From Swiss-Prot:
Residues 304-323 have a biased composition (Basic residues). It comes from the Eukaryota. It is found in: Mitochondrion. InterPro entries: Ribosomal_Su5_D2-typ_SF, Ribosomal_uS9, Ribosomal_uS9_bac/plastid, Ribosomal_uS9_CS, Ribsml_uS5_D2-typ_fold_subgr. It comes from Debaryomyces hansenii (strain ATCC 36239 / CBS 767 / BCRC 21394 / JCM 1990 / NBRC 0083 / IGC 2968). This is Small ribosomal subunit protein uS9m.
Length: 323
């Protein structure tokens, strides 16, 4: 029954003023209940309704939240923490890879490096742009410049001397290796001393081939079962054999046993020289840079040029006669 219908009943008097005040009181109770509920949920005191429109009134609000809200250990345990430190970056997985490679470079910055030859670069290639894009699943965010940055850091790590390369660097290089060419590439073997403490290597020059055994000793040199003076009577040949020891300042500290075949005395002497240089690197890899600067790690590939038909020798032409 509505209020208007009640007015039509005779003898019934209704105070509209009392009814309106009761409604306002109910509304205030509902507002206070909602404010107390919000305060319990948020943990922050709200401004009372009677002070919202008041001017000049000072409201005291505590400066700290409730302690139980700050010490919610269950929330700390269940909250989601990103796995990567670069989660909020533009390209998280790629940036994490760069951070890892830069960290390894800074860690092993003092290790000696080498010049990677073209043959090794062709045999051991790193992951391509398309394969890297599929692996990290970055979509269009990965650009070719990002792949170039990655390969530059990988080439810097690969330039570390193989004899001194740490295990974690080798694992990272294997992680970014090109899987399509892994079956075709030949693993580079690091030479070490044999069970008798000897370093064995092969030296070549012209047509001569020398197999050189190097051990710690007092400076004796044997070539094909003969002494150095007996096998190489020329002083220039003996100087070539002693040259690697002079470069590293270790004369008289090793014994040399060489087996040489083919070629002349000069070719055989230089073949033994290159073999001794390789053996010294096996004993101490740190000597490689010094021997490389002296030209002992790259053999002289020149050979005698064959005689051509119509020529007196390889290039000399016969004397021209007018008549």
């Amino acid at each position: 029954m509505s209020v208007r219908s009640l007015y039509g009943i005779s003898g019934l008097r209704i105070s509209t003023r009392t009814f309106s005040k009761t409604a306002f009181r109910l509304q205030e109770q509902v507002n206070q209940t909602q404010e107390s509920t919000d305060t319990e949920i948020n943990g922050r005191p709200l401004v009372p309704a009677n002070l919202k429109n008041a001017k000049g009134e000072r409201l005291m609000i505590p400066s700290k939240l409730q302690e139980n809200a700050l010490r919610n250990y269950e929330l700390e345990r269940l909250r989601i923490i990103p796995k990567l430190n670069t989660f909020y970056g533009g390209n998280p997985v790629h940036e994490e890879n760069l951070n890892t490679l830069n960290g390894l470079i800074r860690k092993y910055i003092n290790l000696p490096t080498r010049i990677v030859d073209d043959k090794e670069i062709q045999n051991t290639k790193f992951v391509s742009f398309e394969e890297y894009k599929t692996r990290i699943q970055s979509g269009t965010r990965l650009k070719p410049i990002h792949h170039k940055e990655l390969t530059q850091l990988l080439h810097r790590l690969r330039s570390i001397d193989p004899e001194l390369m740490p295990r974690e660097v080798s694992d990272v290089l294997a992680k970014f290796a090109n899987t399509s060419s892994e079956s075709a590439k030949a693993a580079q073997k690091v030479k070490t001393l044999d069970e008798f403490g000897r370093a064995i290597s092969l030296g070549k020059r012209k047509r001569s081939v020398a197999k050189v055994y190097l051990t710690k000793g007092d400076g004796q040199v044997m070539v094909n079962g003969k002494s150095l003076l007996e096998y190489f009577p020329k002083e220039a040949d003996r100087r070539r054999i002693a040259y690697p020891f002079q470069v590293v300042s270790q004369e008289g500290q090793y014994n040399v046993f060489a087996e040489v075949q083919s070629g002349g005395s000069t070719g055989q002497a230089e073949a033994v020289m290159y073999g001794i240089a390789k053996d010294l690197v096996i004993f101490n890899p740190l000597l490689k840079s010094r021997l490389h600067k002296s030209g002992l790690m790259t053999r002289d590939a020149r050979k005698v040029e064959r005689k051509k038909p119509g020529k007196v020798k390889a290039r000399k032409s016969p004397t021209w006669v007018k008549r």
